[in-house]
């Protein structure tokens, strides 16, 4: 195996401390990350930097590497390498020395199968009105960079322009293939999953594919019937309140709910009778006339009965 100059790869000196080397690693990992860099050899450079960091970040591996680098031009280097404790290794053990020092990036790396990158999930808030049509959205997320030990070393900001299809529902997952973390040893990238969260609406509640809206009406509108303007997701409509309507009554407006590929829901107007403010003398007299005319009506007649 070729003995690479890891210090040159990292752009540091052999005398630099771990903090300096770590700073260089983060800078280069960000620069050559395949999802960020436009350079044609970015992936190869990224793996080379990761390989150098794996060795130089470990005190024992770095010491062994330094000793091997010091003897790299020794004619005996290919036949015998003297470890710090005096133990000798012949050419048969040479590959094992490299494997013990360089870990995943030496002999073992040739034996490891390709591994798929990690998937990433992010939540995307969508307004109810936006579910009616396909729309574009710019999303930003952090792409984790894993070190040789499977730990997150840093996170690289990434921005994508995506299309949110019409008819998305709360909790729906949208897959963006290959936008997760990079694979290992030629494996495919992971995916990015957008998890849709329908933002709460000040007027509408979601019930499956249907919508509910509370419609305030006056006592006389409920009693006599009326036509009132009610908003929907697209436009306002004129809703007919039947005479004798009750509080809590649900009036169905067909086809004004949520839209999906399979079906279109309905809008349900839930009536809420709102009393006027404290009446003046004239208004109180009118209420009294109504009470006298309906003296036989007892709203609590069947109260508590099954």
Curated annotation (Swiss-Prot):
PROSITE patterns: DNAJ_1 (PS00636), DNAJ_2 (PS50076)
A GO biological process held by the record: chaperone cofactor-dependent protein refolding
Primary localization: cytoplasm
Keywords: Chaperone, Cytoplasm, DNA-binding
A single cellular component GO annotation: cytoplasm
The keyword Magnesium appears for this protein: no
Spans through the membrane: none
Job description of the protein: DNA-binding protein that preferentially recognizes a curved DNA sequence. It is probably a functional analog of DnaJ; displays overlapping activities with DnaJ, but functions under different conditions, probably acting as a molecular chaperone in an adaptive response to environmental stresses other than heat shock. Lacks autonomous chaperone activity; binds native substrates and targets them for recognition by DnaK. Its activity is inhibited by the binding of CbpM.
HAMAP family: CbpA
Protein name from the UniProt record: Curved DNA-binding protein
Record organism: Escherichia coli O139:H28 (strain E24377A / ETEC)
Lineage of source species: Bacteria, Pseudomonadati, Pseudomonadota, Gammaproteobacteria, Enterobacterales
Gene: cbpA
């Amino acid at each position: 195996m070729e003995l690479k100059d890891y210090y040159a790869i990292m752009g540091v000196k052999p005398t630099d401390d771990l903090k300096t080397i770590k700073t260089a690693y983060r800078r280069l990992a960000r620069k050559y990350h395949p999802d960020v860099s436009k350079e044609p050899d970015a992936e190869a450079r990224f793996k080379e930097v990761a390989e150098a960091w794996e060795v130089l970040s470990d005190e024992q591996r770095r010491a062994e590497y330094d000793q091997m680098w010091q003897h790299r031009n020794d004619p005996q280097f290919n036949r015998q390498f003297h470890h710090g404790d005096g133990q000798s290794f012949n050419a048969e053990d040479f590959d094992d020395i490299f494997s013990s020092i360089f870990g995943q990036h030496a002999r073992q790396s040739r034996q490891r199968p390709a591994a798929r990158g990690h998937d990433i999930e992010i939540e995307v808030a969508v307004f109810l009105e936006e579910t009616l049509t396909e729309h574009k959205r710019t999303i930003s997320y952090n792409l984790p960079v894993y070190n040789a030990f499977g730990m997150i070393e840093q996170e690289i900001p990434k921005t994508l322009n995506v299309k949110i299809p019409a008819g998305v529902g709360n909790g729906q997952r949208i897959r963006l293939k290959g936008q997760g973390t990079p694979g290992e040893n030629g494996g495919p990238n992971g995916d990015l999953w957008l998890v849709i969260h329908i933002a709460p609406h000040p007027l509408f509640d979601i019930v499956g594919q249907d919508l509910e809206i509370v419609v305030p009406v006056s006592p006389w509108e409920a009693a006599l019937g009326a036509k009132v303007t009610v908003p929907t997701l697209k436009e306002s409509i004129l809703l007919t309140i039947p005479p004798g309507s009750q509080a809590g009554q649900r009036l169905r407006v067909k086809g004004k709910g949520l839209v999906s590929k399979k079906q279109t829901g309905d809008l349900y107007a839930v009536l809420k009778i709102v009393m006027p403010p404290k009446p003046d003398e004239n208004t109180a007299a009118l209420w009294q006339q109504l009470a006298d005319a309906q003296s036989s009506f007892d709203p609590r007649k069947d109260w508590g009965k099954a």
